[in-house]
């Protein structure tokens, strides 16, 4: 191959790469537009049934994030995975509506800034500490991890319990047996089912890993990674506190 031919081959490859990059960027923009449209439709459908929630429903900007599953919020922005959100909406738009309202309720009840009430209810090591025997670091970490998981679960159950009790067309959905039984046990306490109360009740159940995982799967709706409470070193967001 001569010098001219090699130069032409390189230039052709560069042009192809530029075209592919432009096409990928265009496709990403189209996916982001579609995701934003879906969330806007969810907001509008919820508004027509819950006009008193107007301000809360309209308090977000929407941003694509392929690292999230399927969506999540930090109180300012709703992040969404375009394919997962699109798939959810295609499966049934009610699921997307419920997800939107679920995230709004996390903000309204300030789940996004609250930290787990504590790990003591999930650790037998406390008894050892009280007797002057220090807990092992690994055991402490397991207790903290379980407390965090149960707190996330408690926040999700609190939001879902409200949504399931709405009986409004945009969010009406059949409940599984596990969900019905979970509500029945929690309601038996006779207390208002806020996240703190649910957390306290879950601690009494002595959940096995399998039982906890089943409940997490049943009530999982959104990704909590952007919650202020997930980063202990993050300073309080005054704008967020004033907003919610």
Where are these predicted regions, by residue range?
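Short, functionally important secondary-structure microenvironments
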Residues: 2-14, 18-97, 104-244
């Amino acid at each position: 191959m001569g010098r001219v031919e090699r130069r032409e081959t390189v230039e052709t490859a560069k042009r192809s790469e530029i075209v592919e990059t432009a096409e990928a960027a265009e496709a990403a923009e189209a996916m982001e537009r579609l995701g934003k449209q879906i969330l806007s439709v969810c907001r509008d459908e919820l508004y027509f049934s819950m006009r008193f929630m107007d301000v809360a429903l309209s308090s977000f900007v929407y941003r694509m994030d392929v690292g999230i599953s399927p969506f999540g919020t930090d109180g300012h922005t709703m992040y969404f995975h375009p394919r997962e959100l699109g798939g959810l909406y295609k499966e049934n738009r009610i699921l997307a509506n419920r997800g939107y309202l679920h995230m709004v309720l996390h903000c309204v009840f300030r789940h996004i800034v609250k930290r787990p009430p504590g790990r003591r209810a999930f650790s037998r090591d406390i008894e050892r500490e009280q007797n002057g025997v220090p807990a092992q670091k690994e055991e402490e970490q397991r207790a903290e991890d379980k407390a965090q998981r149960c707190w996330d679960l408690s926040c999700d159950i609190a939001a879902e319990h409200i949504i399931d009790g709405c009986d409004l067309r945009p969010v009406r959905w059949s409940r599984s047996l596990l969900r019905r039984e979970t509500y029945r046990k929690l309601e038996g306490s006779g207390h208002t089912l806020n996240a703190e109360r649910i957390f306290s009740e879950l601690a009494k159940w002595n959940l096995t890993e399998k039982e906890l995982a089943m409940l997490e799967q049943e009530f999982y709706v959104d990704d909590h990674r952007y919650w202020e409470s997930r980063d202990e070193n993050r300073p309080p967001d005054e704008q967020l506190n004033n907003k919610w």
